[in-house]
From Swiss-Prot:
It comes from Solibacter usitatus (strain Ellin6076). Pfam families: Ribosomal_L11, Ribosomal_L11_N. Forms part of the ribosomal stalk which helps the ribosome interact with GTP-bound translation factors. This is Large ribosomal subunit protein uL11. Part of the ribosomal stalk of the 50S ribosomal subunit. Interacts with L10 and the large rRNA to form the base of the stalk. L10 forms an elongated spine to which L12 dimers bind in a sequential fashion forming a multimeric L10(L12)X complex. The gene is rplK.
């Protein structure tokens, strides 16, 4: 018989840097989950040179016996764009002030990374979505 799901918690945590402090502790504490077990498992799964400094979304499923499973997603598109362009944040006035440029090759690479988590089925639609996000951040697509 399957375990009964009591809650599903969605968080965005830096890769390899989950700690019992907020936001992890405040989200999992009321559910009765062992926070340190989650932090150790998450940090073990997300630690690595390729994910260093990225924010990784995670969906934690909590069961009635206080056990849990979690699924990590791909980093948000704005985080990948900021990493590709090497900027700290997007433009406060995106259509007036541009903060950087991104190439079509970089857009395609980001779209390939995000394709499993996006609600589109082909690479062209994913690239259009990434280009739109870049434009709304004040990044020129060249």
């Amino acid at each position: 018989m399957a375990k009964k799901v009591t809650a599903q918690v969605k968080l965005q945590i830096p890769a390899g840097k989950a700690t019992p402090a907020p936001p992890v502790g405040t989200a999992l504490g009321p559910q009765g989950v062992n926070i340190m077990d989650f932090c150790k498992a998450y940090n073990a799964k997300t630690s690595g040179k390729d994910q260093e400094g990225l924010i990784i979304p995670v969906v934690i499923t909590i069961y009635s016996d206080r056990s849990f499973t979690f699924i990590t997603k791909t980093p948000p598109v704005p985080v990948l764009i900021k990493r590709a362009v090497a900027i700290a944040k997007g433009s406060p006035e995106p259509h007036k002030t541009k903060v950087g440029k991104i190439t079509q090759a970089q857009v395609e690479e980001i779209a390939k990374i995000k394709l499993p988590d996006l609600n589109c089925f082909d690479l062209d639609a994913a690239m259009r979505s990434v280009r739109g996000t870049a434009r709304s951040m004040g990044v020129d697509v060249v």
